[in-house]
């Protein structure tokens, strides 16, 4: 737990390659042949500036190294909403991310199947919203993979 939180909030990236290998192995095992491209849940420009990095993008890129492919940027976070980690109620978490993302290029999304990468899943609100946006932009399918799951799940 401490290592993941240090990675997410303090940019402690010494375990990044191991995380990428672990996620690549799990994705191949669980989702083999179910996706055409790999993408990630982005952070807002404001959070990127504050934190200095996008942890889900880094996880996605690390996973893609193992497969000799490039991640595809599909989503843009258009609203710097309060951090999900500070919200406990699942309904409030869903409302907090509603409308926070938009497709970067719907034409590049249409008809493709995506593996969507995020760092930690708690209630699934963020992933659900990102899947909704990708499918509304024409994605044929979206499967999700996270590095960790919150204890309550």
Enumerate the language-model features and the residues they cover.
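Extended interfacial segments that mediate partner engagement and assembly in macromolecular machines
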Residues: 1-65, 90
